[in-house]
């Protein structure tokens, strides 16, 4: 593909994804060896914004996405570029589009960077704030484990009655309301949908999601490490 072809790509904001477009987006995820599935794309389409670069044939060859959180910041994610289109400035182009829209909404852009993406983001003015590790546990035979809990704390499946105080607990810890995101996660990995309670007060919770290559545990929010 000639370098000048980048300028011929059509950048579109997607209010929905057709089955063919979803196949294209999932192919980018697979190529990058990421874990997202169709439900994750739907989350961004329904509650945020997805940007897609279309080749002349109509196929999606690159993406980025944003997810606003409250009135303070927005998350940039799903920055994916197909192999033949890499190292031609397309990731930067899609990032700038996402950043411009967040700035227009007076939201601070935030993201987490893979090692490959960090150089791109640093050139755009992003700075390191914190680091994290993504851990993987190989599949093992299922067995029941009774956790050692702090005195007075119990853990049980999340109920509908838990949901409003759970979302309030999360917002206080996270710094913004993200009820829609939590609601989209709930039920995707039912065994992970747990709440920790101490004398009728929520002191922690966990959600999860199914993935392309692994079940993902998180969001996990707790008052302390022992509860987590």
Enumerate the predicted regions with their spans.
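Intrinsically disordered, low-complexity, positively biased terminal segments
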Residues: 1-10, 16-23, 43, 55-59, ...
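Basic, Lys/Arg-rich alpha-helical nucleic-acid-recognition elements, primarily the DNA-binding modules
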Residues: 31-49, 63-86, 94, 99-100
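Small/polar loops that bind or transfer phosphate-bearing groups
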Residues: 77, 112-113, 158
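Active-site/acyl-donor-binding loops of N-acyltransferases
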Residues: 2, 113, 124-144, 209, ...
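Conserved active-site alpha-helix within GNAT-family acetyltransferase domains
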Residues: 60, 88, 92-93, 104-109, ...
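Short hydrophobic/aromatic beta-strand or adjacent loop that forms the aromatic wall/cage
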Residues: 48-50, 130-134, 191-193
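Surface-exposed beta-loop interaction hotspot
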Residues: 129, 134-164, 168-170
